[in-house]
Amino acid sequence: MAREFSLENTRNIGIMAHIDAGKTTATERILYYTGRIHKIGETHEGASQMDWMEQEQERGITITSAATTAQWKGHRVNIIDTPGHVDFTVEVERSLRVLDGAVAVLDAQSGVEPQTETVWRQATTYGVPRIVFVNKMDKIGADFLYSVGTIHDRLQANAHPIQLPIGAEDEFNGIIDLVEECAYMYGNDLGTDIQRVEIPEEHKELAEEYRGKLIEAVAELDEEMMMKYLEGEEITVEELKAGIRKATTSVEFFPVICGSAFKNKGVQILLDAVIDYLPSPLDVPAIKGIVPDTDEEVERKSSDEEPFAALAFKIMTDPYVGKLTFFRVYSGVLNSGSYVKNSTKGKRERVGRILQMHANSREEISTVYAGDIAAAVGLKDTTTGDTLCDEKSLVILESMEFPEPVISVAIEPKSKADQDKMGTALSKLSEEDPTFRAHTDQETGQTIIAGMGELHLDIIVDRMRREFKVEANVGAPQVAYRETFRAAAKVEGKFARQSGGRGQFGHVWIEFEPNEEGKGFEFENKIVGGVVPREYIPAVGAGLEDALKNGVLAGYPVVDIKAALVDGSYHDVDSSEMAFKIAASMALKAAVSKCNPVILEPMMKVEVVIPEEYMGDIMGDVTSRRGRVEGMEARGNAQVVRAMVPLSEMFGYATSLRSNTQGRGTFSMVFDHYEEVPKSVSEEIIKKNKGE
């Protein structure tokens, strides 16, 4: 089957936003207008096409990024709908990694919200060009220019409107196109009756002002246009479009458009903007990778002629076909039934069938080309982040890094029958989601599951019940504390056991010192003159790593320290790897008294939105939870409190906020960093963990 759409007519985009900004509704409408859906599904009725897991339909939030293909004006648009809830940021990271562009959806009443900031940061990390769609222009309190202001203030982004709304709230009935200098008025509710008209007289002045600002902003990034602009020459529509496209694809400029997906306004114009301004696979830099054996850096260009290379970015268990592996093809062509190499794991895989996904219906295809996104059936060993490539031309594409879980709970099956199924369910779920971990606690024998937040773990337990028919009891949430050293010291670890027969002997001197935050554990060998033989040095590093996992104060993993092996001694007969491992762990224990160990706790960035009259109660509540208020602002007729609060104090906050504000307050939180625990709290944690 020949290629249906050329590479330059392909767009791989993600739709990203804060929870409730209307992202899924926007995707729905795109599918409706591109002819993929015959009846529109409303998210708040639980009928949306993209939210296809049962819980998503119940909770009205998107959990897994569904990938779907649509067509618009001779272009193929592959869309990934990403979740906006903070507990699912890993889904967003995964999809951004394989996209070429994104649409950031904002709520016209709130503008940029905390999760928008997180997602925006992630998109910046991956260098993803973005268009901003200010949605919900029909909502009470909608304010387009306020929303644009929040993009400047909170994201420090060079964003400029390329459209202006005509009216707002109930009066929102049209859009001014600043590029083409015209307006679009809507004649019916389905948004299919659009009249292109001249800009209404009463809006002309504002439109001219903002068109001038737009041209100036684009000209600043384009020398030729700048010259024309300074010389007072007219800049044509084509030149302006080309300038916006160039600046957007190089991630220097972000066009802002507006609409109301729910009221079917502005969606076709959003699709036009995706095609006009977001990059095709040819416009983004070639992906880099390394050759497995030589570590030589190579690049794969977006072309069908290059050897096949793709990245698996999502695993899903489908009730009908089993395991689905979603992948993005960067170069080359893949036919169903062929063999590929999983170069990350060094395994050969057979691609049984290739499916093109549409939310949760699917179409079988025989071939995928460079730039496509599809799902494969039949891959046994491939997990998220693995590279699939041509067996004759191996490459490992840069993989994805996932954050460590911050919260854990103990979980136990309700019956013996559930016990066996639970193991299978947990391993399948952790295969699908790299930020979800399950392990058995060595000391208590309990099964512990860990993830990115309470909602994340609720949904995992829910999925176990629905998809795997496993009933389980869940314990109280536990915070993922960490430990670290605040002072440097040189300590000795000596393990000598000579009691007849072959003894054990290992002796080390290790210098411990604090490392930079986020750098983890670093081990360095500074032995001179062979006082500790070369073959035992890895054992010292391994001994330390093992001992660090169980902490020095309260049994939490020790992070961000440096250890240098500086001296020691050995015995010709009695020394062994085991003895040096034990000596290293003894040195770590000895460091407790000298290195000033402290406990660290995860701090959450919290944003609470409340009616003004509850301000005092909420501020008091935040302070009582050891929170620091970092800022306040009025948003419409509500107050927004931004604070940094320890995760351990946020359990059950949703219930407390509801009762404090008669259900009128909302909050969102996202993990920010680790911070030292106050002494009184630290003592309590140590006592609790030692069972006192």
From Swiss-Prot:
SMART domains named in the record: EFG_C (SM00838), EFG_IV (SM00889)
Binding site for GTP: 17-24, 81-85, 135-138
InterPro entries listed in its UniProt record: EFG_II (IPR041095), EFG_III (IPR009022), EFG_III/V (IPR035647), EFG_IV (IPR047872), EFG_V (IPR035649), EFG_V-like (IPR000640), EFTu-like_2 (IPR004161), G_TR_CS (IPR031157)
Signal peptide feature range: none
MF GO annotations: GTP binding; GTPase activity; translation elongation factor activity
UniProt record, GO biological process: ribosome disassembly
Entry superkingdom: Bacteria
Alphabetically ordered keywords of this record: Cytoplasm, Elongation factor, GTP-binding, Nucleotide-binding, Protein biosynthesis
Descriptive protein name: Elongation factor G
Compartments in which it is found: Cytoplasm
Function recorded in the entry: Catalyzes the GTP-dependent ribosomal translocation step during translation elongation. During this step, the ribosome changes from the pre-translocational (PRE) to the post-translocational (POST) state as the newly formed A-site-bound peptidyl-tRNA and P-site-bound deacylated tRNA move to the P and E sites, respectively. Catalyzes the coordinated movement of the two tRNA molecules, the mRNA and conformational changes in the ribosome.
Originating gene: fusA
GO cellular component terms, A-Z: cytoplasm
Chloroplast recorded as keyword: no
Limits of the tr-type G domain: 8-282
PROSITE patterns given in the database record: G_TR_1, G_TR_2
Family statement drawn from the similarity comment of this UniProt entry: Belongs to the TRAFAC class translation factor GTPase superfamily. Classic translation factor GTPase family. EF-G/EF-2 subfamily.
